[in-house]
Amino acid sequence: MTEEIAGFQTSPKAQVQAAFEEIARRSMHALSFLHPSMPVYVSDFTLFEGQWTGCVITPWMLSAVIFPGPDQLWPLRKVSEKIGLQLPYGTMTFTVGELDGVSQYLSCSLMSPLSHSMSIEEGQRLTDDCARMILSLPVTNPDVPHAGRRALLFGRRSGENA
């Protein structure tokens, strides 16, 4: 077995879609918590810092996923290993997974199980929105007063004498 995983030169969307559809068909179809009508849907992937980043919804979950990008070599990791990553959205904990015939990847559960009241269109829109959100820069209000570092350290509020 190789010690490194080669990246995808182009988006792995089609391979990821096919792999999750096979999992759904082969081993997940009889579980009671499955969304009864949600198909597998994979958002478009975006290259972020050399890695393919996107989201996938299945009848059993919605997850953010990361696959190795062009010219990347990932070390082979233990499936189920946890890795914290800093994305523009914030720090997220990912779990190493492996899709047969695709590669190892990183996955962060965003929703599981899915609400049975969610329509297919809502699920697909949510998947696309989540893919954009995890790579969106956080927005803050510059007019909100911030306590200085010294005030935080010594328990003083702005406006008090130092």
Swiss-Prot record:
Alphabetized Pfam families for the sequence: NiFe-hyd_HybE (PF11939)
Taxonomic superkingdom: Bacteria
Entry similarity comment: Belongs to the HupJ family.
Annotated protein name in UniProt: Hydrogenase-2 operon protein HybE
